[in-house]
Amino acid sequence: MKIIFAGTPEFAATALAALLKTSHEIIAVYTQPDRKAGRGQKLTPSPVKQLALEHNIPVYQPLHFKASTEEGLAAQQELAALGADVMVVAAYGLILPQAVLDTPKYGCLNIHGSLLPRWRGAAPIQRAIATGDDETGITIMQMAAGLDTGDMMYKTYCPITSEDTSATLHDKLAAQGATAICAVLESEETLQKYLAEREVQDESLTVYAHKLVKSEARIDWSMNAVQVDRNIRAFNPWPVAFIQLDENNALRVWNSTISNQNKADAQAGEIIAIDKQGVHVACGENTFICLTSVQWPGGKALNAQQIAQTQKLHVGQILP
């Protein structure tokens, strides 16, 4: 089949790489415009664009597809002229109007990083960890105009462990998404079968995964240790949990575990011990967490042993 692929980050590039190994023809790739990145703020192509260029696939980077503007209408017409059988969309980042969704012969299929209708929206991986879900997965759906509202065609399941961060879970789901889309697109007959058997989402089970904002990542010591640990794992690798030491300095916290230490009448935010495991801090409900990897402003991330050697933190200190 002739496939258009639309996606931007590494999650999408993993799926594109898998599709490139099939007998299908990737006739075009759509991805977001190049962005400034790194210390030099150089314009950098997305992971999907980089992969497409390596395989000599034409790349399109429209700003939008709004038919109310000349450039949006031109982008729609350009896509239609490609004559695709199906369009695969994964973390593309642009809204696709109904006219675009209807253009390919079999419409547009989306690779979504949750078990829909739970965690529709921008941050399904992070919200699943922060909420304490013990399972997530991938949903392949036929796209509709609403936000992740399309009919479901295929699901895979992935347990969430107590060690998973958004980084590790992202990689697991990216691999599952790649496998899932290849299964759905094994042949034209297979695709027709999954389209015929697709399932409407139960709106009563909908939960939204709202976009992350940096302020959420500030550690709130009044929460119990289990929730603090979930948040630290959910916000790794972005925006990274932090302790606001003073107006200008934040201590980033990359990893943690539930502490085996305790202290009666400890104040929330109080450091009760520093040892080879890490920095043990009191949280709400008389629970305790152990910070195992932290990063001071301008420095590198330190492990538990290195934290103790810096002597920048001390037992009895109250973290804000």
From Swiss-Prot:
Pfam families: Formyl_trans_C, Formyl_trans_N. Transmembrane segments: none annotated. Its EC number is 2.1.2.9. GO terms for cellular component: cytosol. The keyword Plastid does not apply. One of its GO terms (molecular function) is methionyl-tRNA formyltransferase activity. Disulfide bonds: none annotated. (6S)-5,6,7,8-tetrahydrofolate binds at residues 114-117. It catalyses: L-methionyl-tRNA(fMet) + (6R)-10-formyltetrahydrofolate = N-formyl-L-methionyl-tRNA(fMet) + (6S)-5,6,7,8-tetrahydrofolate + H(+). It comes from the Bacteria. InterPro entries: Fmt, Formyl_trans_C, Formyl_trans_C_sf, Formyl_transf_N, Formyl_transf_N_sf, Formyl_transferase-like_C_sf, Met-tRNA-FMT_C, Met-tRNA-FMT_N. Keywords: Protein biosynthesis, Transferase. NCBIfam families: fmt. PANTHER family: METHIONYL-TRNA FORMYLTRANSFERASE, METHIONYL-TRNA FORMYLTRANSFERASE, MITOCHONDRIAL. Belongs to the Fmt family. Attaches a formyl group to the free amino group of methionyl-tRNA(fMet). The formyl group appears to play a dual role in the initiator identity of N-formylmethionyl-tRNA by promoting its recognition by IF2 and preventing the misappropriation of this tRNA by the elongation apparatus. This is Methionyl-tRNA formyltransferase. The gene is fmt.
